[in-house]
């Protein structure tokens, strides 16, 4: 399963075109522009569009993914934008981040395998300082209805890899939600996110 998961993303990111475009996610952009720049971590960052954008705002951006192909694309994008990002390849518990070393964590379409997604969310908590911010956007469980109508919108087809409001409240139980909603949005992100979809979005502060 792990090898299949890695192969899937390496194959997607090895193409010349950026799978989800070179521009940042709209929700992330909107939220980061409200915050004072600091240190930020991007799990499952893929080709780096969001970390690179954060770096252009003055954030010290760290990122990780299991895909070395994703990292290669991300570093090229950073160079194109005249910024640097700290991008590692591996899984969270192997990367050596220091506890409470980040001011923010951005989870943007970070759809981990269903069996481990909650554990990863809870594992990320120790790296975020008290009072730090999580910015989250990912597909909701209702999104399967949108995929059935138009596969171009992308996203996991396994309902257990998708999210509900109750699920994120449970995973982030020691956070105060500054905003939290399930919403239909129009996606226009590169090759694989196009059309109407259903997402969970939130901004939350660690207690």
Model-predicted segments: where are they?
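Conserved SAM-binding strand-loop segment of SAM-dependent methyltransferases
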Residues: 81-93
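A short SAM/SAH-binding and catalytic strip from SAM-dependent methyltransferases
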Residues: 103-118
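Conserved SAM/SAH-binding beta-strand->alpha-helix loop
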Residues: 67-69
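A short glycine-rich, Lys/Arg-flanked "PGG" loop and its adjoining helix->strand segment in the class I
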Residues: 118-130
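Conserved class I S-adenosyl-L-methionine
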Residues: 1-35
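Conserved beta-strand signature within the Rossmann-like core of class I S-adenosyl-L-methionine
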Residues: 131-139
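Short alpha-helix
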Residues: 159-182
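A short acidic, Gly/Pro-enriched loop at the edge of an enzyme's catalytic core
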Residues: 93-104
């Amino acid at each position: 399963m792990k090898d299949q998961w890695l192969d899937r993303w390496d194959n997607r990111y090895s193409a010349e075109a950026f799978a989800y475009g070179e521009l940042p996610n709209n929700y992330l952009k909107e939220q980061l522009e409200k915050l004072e720049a600091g240190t930020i971590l991007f799990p499952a960052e893929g080709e780096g569009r969001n970390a690179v954008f954060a770096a252009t705002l003055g954030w010290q951006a760290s990122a990780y993914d299991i895909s070395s192909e994703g990292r290669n694309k991300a570093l090229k994008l950073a160079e194109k934008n005249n910024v640097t990002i700290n991008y590692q390849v591996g899984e969270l518990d192997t990367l050596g981040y220091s506890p409470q070393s980040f001011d923010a964590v951005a989870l943007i379409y970070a759809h981990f395998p269903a069996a481990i997604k909650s554990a990863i969310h809870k594992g990320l908590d120790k790296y975020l300082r008290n009072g730090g911010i999580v910015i989250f956007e990912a597909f909701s469980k209702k999104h399967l209805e949108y995929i059935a109508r138009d596969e171009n919108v992308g996203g996991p087809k396994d309902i257990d890899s998708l999210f509900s409001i109750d699920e994120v409240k449970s995973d982030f139980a020691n956070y105060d939600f500054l905003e939290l909603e399930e919403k239909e949005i129009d996606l226009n992100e590169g090759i694989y996110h196009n059309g109407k979809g259903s997402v969970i979005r939130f901004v939350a502060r660690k207690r």
